[in-house]
Protein backbone atom coordinates (compact mmCIF):
# COMPACT_ATOMS: atom_id res chain seq x y z
CA UNK A 1 0.00 0.00 0.00
CA UNK A 2 2.86 2.40 0.79
CA UNK A 3 4.35 1.89 -2.65
CA UNK A 4 0.97 2.55 -4.25
CA UNK A 5 0.57 5.80 -2.34
CA UNK A 6 4.03 6.93 -3.37
CA UNK A 7 3.41 6.01 -7.00
CA UNK A 8 0.06 7.83 -7.01
CA UNK A 9 1.80 10.91 -5.64
CA UNK A 10 4.69 10.65 -8.09
CA UNK A 11 2.38 10.24 -11.09
CA UNK A 12 -0.02 12.99 -10.00
CA UNK A 13 2.80 15.52 -9.94
CA UNK A 14 4.67 14.10 -12.95
CA UNK A 15 7.66 13.19 -10.80
CA UNK A 16 8.01 16.67 -9.29
CA UNK A 17 8.22 15.34 -5.74
CA UNK A 18 10.89 14.95 -3.06
CA UNK A 19 11.59 12.83 0.02
CA UNK A 20 11.88 14.66 3.33
CA UNK A 21 14.94 12.96 4.82
CA UNK A 22 15.96 13.57 8.44
CA UNK A 23 18.54 10.80 8.70
CA UNK A 24 16.36 9.04 11.29
CA UNK A 25 15.23 5.47 10.86
CA UNK A 26 11.71 6.31 9.63
CA UNK A 27 12.81 8.52 6.74
CA UNK A 28 15.68 6.12 6.02
CA UNK A 29 13.09 3.41 5.41
CA UNK A 30 11.00 5.76 3.26
CA UNK A 31 14.00 6.66 1.09
CA UNK A 32 14.92 2.99 0.71
CA UNK A 33 11.38 2.12 -0.39
CA UNK A 34 11.45 4.87 -3.01
CA UNK A 35 14.91 4.13 -4.36
CA UNK A 36 15.62 0.46 -3.82
CA UNK A 37 12.21 -1.21 -3.57
CA UNK A 38 10.45 0.89 -6.21
CA UNK A 39 13.54 1.70 -8.26
CA UNK A 40 12.72 5.41 -8.46
CA UNK A 41 15.95 7.39 -8.37
CA UNK A 42 14.86 10.82 -9.57
CA UNK A 43 13.20 11.74 -6.25
CA UNK A 44 15.68 13.93 -4.35
CA UNK A 45 16.26 13.50 -0.63
CA UNK A 46 16.10 16.84 1.22
CA UNK A 47 17.61 17.30 4.68
CA UNK A 48 16.98 20.28 6.97
CA UNK A 49 20.16 21.07 8.89
CA UNK A 50 18.57 22.57 12.01
CA UNK A 51 21.71 22.32 14.11
CA UNK A 52 19.72 20.16 16.54
CA UNK A 53 20.63 16.77 15.15
CA UNK A 54 22.83 14.24 16.88
CA UNK A 55 26.35 14.33 15.38
CA UNK A 56 25.91 10.69 14.36
CA UNK A 57 22.80 11.57 12.36
CA UNK A 58 24.60 14.32 10.45
CA UNK A 59 27.48 11.95 9.73
CA UNK A 60 25.05 9.33 8.40
CA UNK A 61 23.33 11.89 6.16
CA UNK A 62 26.68 12.84 4.66
CA UNK A 63 27.37 9.20 3.87
CA UNK A 64 24.02 8.66 2.16
CA UNK A 65 25.24 10.50 -0.89
CA UNK A 66 23.19 12.85 -3.03
CA UNK A 67 21.22 14.77 -0.39
CA UNK A 68 20.05 18.35 -0.79
CA UNK A 69 20.65 20.34 2.40
CA UNK A 70 18.53 23.33 3.43
CA UNK A 71 18.79 25.45 6.58
CA UNK A 72 16.47 27.59 8.73
CA UNK A 73 16.85 31.35 9.09
CA UNK A 74 16.90 31.17 12.90
CA UNK A 75 18.76 28.87 15.28
CA UNK A 76 17.16 27.15 18.27
CA UNK A 77 18.36 29.69 20.79
CA UNK A 78 16.90 32.55 18.77
CA UNK A 79 13.56 30.73 18.52
CA UNK A 80 13.46 30.22 22.30
CA UNK A 81 14.32 33.85 22.93
CA UNK A 82 11.60 35.12 20.61
CA UNK A 83 8.82 32.57 21.17
CA UNK A 84 9.55 30.21 24.08
CA UNK A 85 10.56 26.67 25.00
CA UNK A 86 8.99 23.53 23.46
CA UNK A 87 7.49 21.58 26.37
CA UNK A 88 5.07 18.64 26.84
CA UNK A 89 3.75 18.55 23.23
CA UNK A 90 3.14 20.76 20.23
CA UNK A 91 -0.53 20.98 21.13
CA UNK A 92 0.05 21.97 24.77
CA UNK A 93 2.84 24.44 23.99
CA UNK A 94 0.71 26.11 21.33
CA UNK A 95 -2.28 26.37 23.66
CA UNK A 96 -0.17 27.90 26.44
CA UNK A 97 1.46 30.33 24.00
CA UNK A 98 -1.82 31.69 22.66
CA UNK A 99 -3.66 31.57 25.99
CA UNK A 100 -0.95 33.71 27.61
CA UNK A 101 -1.25 36.16 24.74
CA UNK A 102 -5.01 36.31 25.27
CA UNK A 103 -4.50 36.93 28.99
CA UNK A 104 -2.05 39.75 28.27
CA UNK A 105 -4.64 41.34 25.98
CA UNK A 106 -7.49 40.85 28.46
CA UNK A 107 -9.55 38.55 26.22
CA UNK A 108 -9.03 35.16 27.85
CA UNK A 109 -12.63 34.70 29.03
CA UNK A 110 -13.87 33.36 25.68
CA UNK A 111 -10.53 32.24 24.26
CA UNK A 112 -10.58 28.60 23.15
CA UNK A 113 -7.06 27.69 24.23
CA UNK A 114 -7.48 29.31 27.64
CA UNK A 115 -10.77 27.49 28.21
CA UNK A 116 -9.20 24.15 27.27
CA UNK A 117 -6.33 24.73 29.70
CA UNK A 118 -8.89 25.52 32.40
CA UNK A 119 -10.96 22.44 31.53
CA UNK A 120 -13.96 24.57 30.58
CA UNK A 121 -14.31 23.87 26.85
CA UNK A 122 -17.35 21.86 25.70
CA UNK A 123 -18.16 20.08 22.46
CA UNK A 124 -21.18 20.66 20.22
CA UNK A 125 -23.28 18.45 22.49
CA UNK A 126 -22.43 20.46 25.57
CA UNK A 127 -20.18 17.73 26.92
CA UNK A 128 -16.71 18.34 28.27
CA UNK A 129 -14.30 18.61 25.36
CA UNK A 130 -11.79 15.77 24.92
CA UNK A 131 -9.28 18.48 24.04
CA UNK A 132 -9.35 19.99 27.52
CA UNK A 133 -5.92 19.82 29.10
CA UNK A 134 -6.31 21.36 32.55
CA UNK A 135 -3.41 19.22 33.76
CA UNK A 136 -1.13 21.78 32.13
CA UNK A 137 -2.86 24.94 33.33
CA UNK A 138 0.07 25.58 35.69
CA UNK A 139 2.22 26.40 32.65
CA UNK A 140 0.31 29.66 32.32
CA UNK A 141 2.26 30.81 35.38
CA UNK A 142 5.61 29.38 34.33
CA UNK A 143 8.67 31.66 34.60
CA UNK A 144 9.36 30.92 30.93
CA UNK A 145 7.38 31.14 27.70
CA UNK A 146 6.11 28.02 25.92
CA UNK A 147 5.87 27.64 22.16
CA UNK A 148 5.70 25.08 19.37
CA UNK A 149 7.10 27.54 16.83
CA UNK A 150 10.47 25.77 16.64
CA UNK A 151 9.03 23.01 14.43
CA UNK A 152 7.55 25.54 12.01
CA UNK A 153 10.54 27.86 11.89
CA UNK A 154 13.32 25.31 11.90
CA UNK A 155 11.80 22.47 9.87
CA UNK A 156 8.66 23.39 7.96
CA UNK A 157 9.66 26.83 6.71
CA UNK A 158 12.96 25.70 5.09
CA UNK A 159 11.06 22.89 3.38
CA UNK A 160 8.32 25.25 2.20
CA UNK A 161 11.00 27.53 0.76
CA UNK A 162 12.53 24.56 -1.07
CA UNK A 163 9.09 23.57 -2.37
CA UNK A 164 8.41 27.08 -3.65
CA UNK A 165 11.76 27.31 -5.41
CA UNK A 166 11.75 23.78 -6.86
CA UNK A 167 8.04 23.24 -7.45
CA UNK A 168 8.32 19.79 -5.86
CA UNK A 169 5.79 18.28 -3.43
CA UNK A 170 6.88 16.48 -0.23
CA UNK A 171 6.77 12.83 0.78
CA UNK A 172 7.29 12.44 4.52
CA UNK A 173 7.72 9.47 6.87
CA UNK A 174 5.41 10.53 9.69
CA UNK A 175 3.18 7.87 11.24
CA UNK A 176 -0.30 8.19 12.74
CA UNK A 177 0.79 6.23 15.80
CA UNK A 178 3.17 9.01 16.82
CA UNK A 179 0.56 11.47 18.07
CA UNK A 180 -3.16 12.15 18.30
CA UNK A 181 -2.91 15.05 15.86
CA UNK A 182 -1.19 12.90 13.23
CA UNK A 183 -3.77 10.17 13.68
CA UNK A 184 -6.61 12.66 13.24
CA UNK A 185 -5.05 14.09 10.07
CA UNK A 186 -4.65 10.61 8.61
CA UNK A 187 -8.20 9.56 9.45
CA UNK A 188 -9.57 12.72 7.83
CA UNK A 189 -7.31 13.05 4.79
CA UNK A 190 -5.67 9.69 4.22
CA UNK A 191 -2.04 9.27 3.18
CA UNK A 192 -2.08 11.67 0.23
CA UNK A 193 -3.59 15.13 0.62
CA UNK A 194 -3.75 16.54 -2.89
CA UNK A 195 -6.19 19.36 -2.22
CA UNK A 196 -4.78 20.95 0.93
CA UNK A 197 -3.08 24.34 1.06
CA UNK A 198 0.22 22.47 1.26
CA UNK A 199 -0.17 19.14 -0.55
CA UNK A 200 1.74 16.40 1.24
CA UNK A 201 2.15 12.63 1.06
CA UNK A 202 2.41 10.54 4.24
CA UNK A 203 2.59 7.02 2.78
CA UNK A 204 3.78 5.46 6.06
CA UNK A 205 0.90 6.83 8.14
CA UNK A 206 -0.40 3.35 8.97
CA UNK A 207 3.03 1.98 9.92
CA UNK A 208 4.17 1.40 13.48
CA UNK A 209 7.56 1.60 15.15
CA UNK A 210 7.73 -2.19 14.94
CA UNK A 211 7.10 -2.08 11.18
CA UNK A 212 10.02 0.31 10.72
CA UNK A 213 12.42 -1.77 12.78
CA UNK A 214 11.30 -4.97 11.06
CA UNK A 215 11.89 -3.40 7.64
CA UNK A 216 15.43 -2.35 8.54
CA UNK A 217 16.17 -5.73 10.14
CA UNK A 218 14.69 -7.79 7.31
CA UNK A 219 16.06 -5.78 4.39
CA UNK A 220 19.42 -5.20 6.10
CA UNK A 221 19.55 -1.58 4.99
CA UNK A 222 22.09 0.94 6.22
CA UNK A 223 20.89 3.24 8.99
CA UNK A 224 22.43 5.50 11.64
CA UNK A 225 23.51 2.59 13.83
CA UNK A 226 26.08 4.71 15.66
CA UNK A 227 23.21 6.40 17.49
CA UNK A 228 20.51 3.70 17.33
CA UNK A 229 22.79 0.76 18.01
CA UNK A 230 21.84 -2.70 16.78
CA UNK A 231 18.30 -3.82 16.02
CA UNK A 232 17.45 -6.99 17.93
CA UNK A 233 14.42 -9.04 18.92
CA UNK A 234 13.38 -10.07 22.41
CA UNK A 235 11.87 -13.41 23.44
CA UNK A 236 8.42 -12.34 22.27
CA UNK A 237 9.74 -11.36 18.84
CA UNK A 238 9.47 -7.63 19.48
CA UNK A 239 12.12 -5.50 17.79
CA UNK A 240 14.17 -2.96 19.73
CA UNK A 241 17.28 -0.81 19.34
CA UNK A 242 20.17 -1.23 21.73
CA UNK A 243 20.84 2.51 21.96
CA UNK A 244 18.54 5.46 21.16
CA UNK A 245 14.92 4.74 20.30
CA UNK A 246 14.17 8.13 18.75
CA UNK A 247 16.58 10.69 17.33
CA UNK A 248 14.62 13.87 16.83
CA UNK A 249 15.94 17.26 17.85
CA UNK A 250 18.49 16.75 20.63
CA UNK A 251 17.21 19.54 22.89
CA UNK A 252 13.47 19.06 22.31
CA UNK A 253 11.39 18.51 25.47
CA UNK A 254 8.22 17.28 23.75
CA UNK A 255 7.16 14.03 25.41
CA UNK A 256 10.08 13.78 27.82
CA UNK A 257 7.68 13.74 30.79
CA UNK A 258 6.34 10.39 29.56
CA UNK A 259 9.69 8.61 29.35
CA UNK A 260 10.97 6.03 31.78
CA UNK A 261 14.36 6.70 33.29
CA UNK A 262 16.96 7.00 32.03
CA UNK A 263 15.13 9.57 29.90
CA UNK A 264 16.53 11.33 26.85
CA UNK A 265 18.42 13.95 28.86
CA UNK A 266 19.89 11.44 31.30
CA UNK A 267 21.06 9.38 28.33
CA UNK A 268 22.42 12.52 26.67
CA UNK A 269 24.55 13.19 29.77
CA UNK A 270 26.25 9.84 29.19
CA UNK A 271 26.48 9.82 25.41
CA UNK A 272 27.12 13.50 24.61
CA UNK A 273 28.22 15.32 27.79
CA UNK A 274 29.10 18.58 26.02
CA UNK A 275 25.68 18.83 24.39
CA UNK A 276 24.10 17.97 27.74
CA UNK A 277 25.97 20.72 29.57
CA UNK A 278 25.04 23.28 26.91
CA UNK A 279 21.34 22.53 26.96
CA UNK A 280 20.87 22.04 30.72
CA UNK A 281 23.11 24.78 32.07
CA UNK A 282 22.88 28.52 31.69
CA UNK A 283 19.80 30.64 31.46
CA UNK A 284 18.95 33.99 32.99
CA UNK A 285 15.92 35.87 34.22
CA UNK A 286 15.12 38.89 32.08
CA UNK A 287 12.21 40.93 33.39
CA UNK A 288 10.58 37.83 34.85
CA UNK A 289 11.10 35.60 31.81
CA UNK A 290 13.64 32.76 31.76
CA UNK A 291 15.85 32.87 28.65
CA UNK A 292 19.07 31.27 27.36
CA UNK A 293 22.34 33.06 28.03
CA UNK A 294 25.99 32.71 27.10
CA UNK A 295 26.40 29.67 29.34
CA UNK A 296 23.66 27.58 27.78
CA UNK A 297 20.01 27.13 26.89
CA UNK A 298 18.80 26.87 30.48
CA UNK A 299 16.65 23.76 30.02
CA UNK A 300 17.45 22.65 33.56
CA UNK A 301 15.11 25.22 35.08
CA UNK A 302 12.36 24.32 32.60
CA UNK A 303 12.66 20.60 33.32
CA UNK A 304 12.62 21.29 37.05
CA UNK A 305 9.38 23.21 36.62
CA UNK A 306 7.61 20.41 34.73
CA UNK A 307 8.96 17.76 37.09
CA UNK A 308 11.35 15.90 34.80
CA UNK A 309 14.57 14.60 36.33
CA UNK A 310 17.61 15.15 34.14
CA UNK A 311 20.47 14.34 36.53
Residue ranges and their predicted role:
Residues 197, 208-311:
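ATP/NTP-dependent adenylation/nucleotidyl-transfer catalytic domains that generate, transfer
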Residues 1-211, 218:
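ATP-dependent adenylation/nucleotidyltransferase module used to activate substrates
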Amino acid sequence: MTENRIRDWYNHYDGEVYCSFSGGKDSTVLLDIIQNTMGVYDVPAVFVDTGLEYPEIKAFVKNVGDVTIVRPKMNFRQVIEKYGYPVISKEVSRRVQYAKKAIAEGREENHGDYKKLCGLAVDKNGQKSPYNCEKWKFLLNAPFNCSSECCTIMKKNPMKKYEKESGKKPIVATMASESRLRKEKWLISGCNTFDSERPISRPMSFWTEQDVLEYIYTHKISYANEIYGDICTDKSGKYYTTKAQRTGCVFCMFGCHLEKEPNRFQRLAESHPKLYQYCINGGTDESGVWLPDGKGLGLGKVLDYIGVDYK
